[in-house]
């Protein structure tokens, strides 16, 4: 919810870091979240995150690249795509998208 309310680059980066480094990978993270998916705050939080990571060029992926201070266009585009695709995978697996 911090990403939605505060709009800080580090909030998006923290989410990306978790998606990238979660022990066991994204499928394990899905399994960990799944028992809580019907909780209202979980739904609200995931929807707010989904809004920020709606496309490759939305604020979530952009903030990830900004926080890492990636300037080279191809590297920046690749990082933004990776951030979007990981979040998209998680949200689709959780049936948020």
What are these regions (language model features)?
Residues 1-97:
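Compositionally biased terminal segments of proteins
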């Amino acid at each position: 919810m911090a990403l939605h309310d505060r709009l800080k680059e580090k909030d998006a980066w923290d989410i990306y870091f978790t998606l990238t480094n979660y022990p066991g990978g994204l499928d394990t993270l899905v399994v960990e979240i799944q028992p809580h998916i019907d909780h209202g705050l979980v739904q609200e939080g995931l929807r707010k995150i989904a809004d920020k990571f709606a496309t490759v060029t939305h604020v979530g992926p952009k903030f990830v690249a900004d926080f890492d201070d990636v300037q080279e266009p191809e590297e920046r585009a690749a990082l933004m795509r990776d951030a979007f695709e990981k979040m998209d995978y998680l949200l689709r697996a959780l049936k948020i998208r």
